[in-house]
Amino acid sequence: MNFLQLEVFRETICTGSIKRVAEQMNLSERGIVDVINDHERDIGFSLFTQNDKGLEPTSEAHRFYKTVENKF
């Protein structure tokens, strides 16, 4: 896990949009997805699910977010 992964995770939770995170961070959407996938592989659980409204954080992501938010 690295700072970029934490920053992308945090921004994705806050915005609910890979597109917005990519625009804010001046990265491609594919790049954001790759960072999220690498992060999920590193921590061993899924952070988001896709639904008709966009990305939905998993229950594990909500718990993890509380830990991450304390570090920012």
Identify the residue ranges that each predicted region occupies.
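Short helix-coil-helix linker/hinge
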Residues: M1-L4, K19, T58
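The DNA-contacting recognition helix of HTH DNA-binding domains
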Residues: F3, E29-R30
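Alpha-helical linker/hinge and terminal dimerization helices associated
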Residues: D42-I43, F64-F72
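A short LG(V/I)-centered, amphipathic sequence patch enriched
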Residues: E40-P57
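Residues within the DNA-recognition helix of helix-turn-helix
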Residues: S28, V35-D38
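Short alpha-helical "packing" element that flanks the helix-turn-helix/winged-helix DNA-binding module
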Residues: V8-T12, F64
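Short helix-boundary/capping micro-motifs
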Residues: E11-N26
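Helix-turn-helix DNA-binding elements, focusing on the entry/boundary residues of the two helices
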Residues: S17-I18, I36, Q50
